[in-house]
């Protein structure tokens, strides 16, 4: 039996640039990504400094496209004591990929990141949290591709993503004829449903008191929690891309408040990497990380 003296809180960052978000995918082709001014290095550096202020260590799910163009960023994240994990290569949702295509991205991104950071990469997060009932096959692919945990399941019901029947707390779940550790994104009960909190737009757009209350809900009940943010979400000065009113509001609203909310949430507990928390919860073997091999 595990006796905890504090809740298992983790913090994660999906390292992608502002022009790579799913909401813009129908308007900005991947072939044009290189024509946009990149802001991911400076924004990630700001998050690293913010984490240092809070004495927090985090898991950085780095997009392969970003790693190829900014290899020094991956090395710097690792050198500051944070976990490097995979966010795929092209930011295509798993629902858009065949099993073979997904396997190729999973392997390519893992090897790329391991080569850059000099440590094993064992964690994965799908773009737009796109592991759902129809894409559970991806978990078996991840296990076969050398990963030990996933953090893609959002146990909510949304149009583009969500797996309402998925786990609401970290667990080992089926991955073909084996299993894999899963650290789901955070939600709180709201009647018969689950309400998303503390991740991406939900951290930024919901009233601050809701985010703080959600974190306190987890803390008081000692429910494991992973907070998630993107580097572009702390950048109110990023270029404005002209799309639909809803897409623009969802992307650009309240970018000037994300860092303040993060600071307040991070004061509620000691935040560490997803890998560390899964090991503490005995969902991964309690062994030290080794160099890539």
Go through each PLM region and give its residues:
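Generic structural signal for well-ordered alpha-helices
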Residues: 44-48, 71-75, 103-110, 139, ...
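Active-site-adjacent pocket scaffolds in enzyme catalytic domains
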Residues: 2-3, 119-122, 126-228
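The substrate-binding groove and active-site-proximal loops of carbohydrate-active enzymes
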Residues: 30-38, 61-63, 90-102, 127-130, ...
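C-terminal domain-boundary segment and adjacent tail
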Residues: 54, 205-293
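Active-site beta->alpha N-cap acidic-glycine motif
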Residues: 2-83
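Generic enzyme active-site microenvironment
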Residues: 12-15, 85, 125, 228
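Short acidic/His/Gly/Ser-rich catalytic and metal-binding motifs that mark active-site loops
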Residues: 18-23, 191-193, 236-241
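Metal-dependent polysaccharide deacetylase catalytic core of the NodB/CE4 family, i.e.
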Residues: 54-135, 147, 152-159, 178, ...
């Amino acid at each position: 039996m595990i006796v905890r003296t504090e809740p298992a809180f983790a913090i994660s960052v999906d390292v992608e640039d502002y022009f790579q978000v799913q909401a813009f995918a129908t308007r900005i082709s991947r072939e044009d990504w290189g024509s946009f001014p990149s802001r991911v290095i400076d924004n990630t550096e700001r998050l690293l400094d913010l984490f240092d202020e809070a004495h927090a260590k985090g898991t950085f799910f780095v997009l392969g496209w970003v790693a190829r163009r900014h290899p020094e960023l991956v090395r710097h994240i690792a050198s500051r004591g944070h976990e490097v994990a995979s966010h795929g290569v092209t930011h295509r949702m798993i629902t858009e990929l065949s099993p073979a295509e997904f396997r190729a991205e999973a392997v390519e991104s893992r090897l790329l990141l391991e080569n850059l950071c000099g440590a094993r990469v064992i964690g994965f997060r799908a773009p737009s949290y796109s592991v759902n009932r129809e894409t559970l096959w991806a978990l078996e692919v991840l296990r076969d591709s050398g990963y030990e945990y996933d953090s893609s399941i959002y146990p909510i019901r949304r149009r583009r993503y969500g797996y309402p029947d998925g786990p609401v707390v970290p667990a080992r779940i089926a991955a073909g004829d084996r299993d894999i550790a899963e650290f789901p994104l955070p939600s709180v009960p709201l009647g018969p449903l689950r309400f998303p909190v503390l991740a991406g737009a939900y951290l930024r757009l919901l009233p601050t008191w809701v985010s703080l209350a959600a974190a306190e809900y987890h803390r008081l009940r000692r429910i494991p929690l992973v907070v998630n943010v993107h580097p572009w979400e702390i950048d109110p000065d990023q270029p404005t891309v002209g799309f639909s009113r809803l897409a623009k509001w969802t992307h650009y609203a309240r970018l000037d408040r994300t860092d303040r909310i993060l600071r307040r949430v991070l004061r509620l507990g000691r935040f560490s990497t997803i890998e560390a928390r899964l090991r503490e919860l005995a969902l991964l073997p309690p062994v030290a990380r080794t160099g890539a091999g």
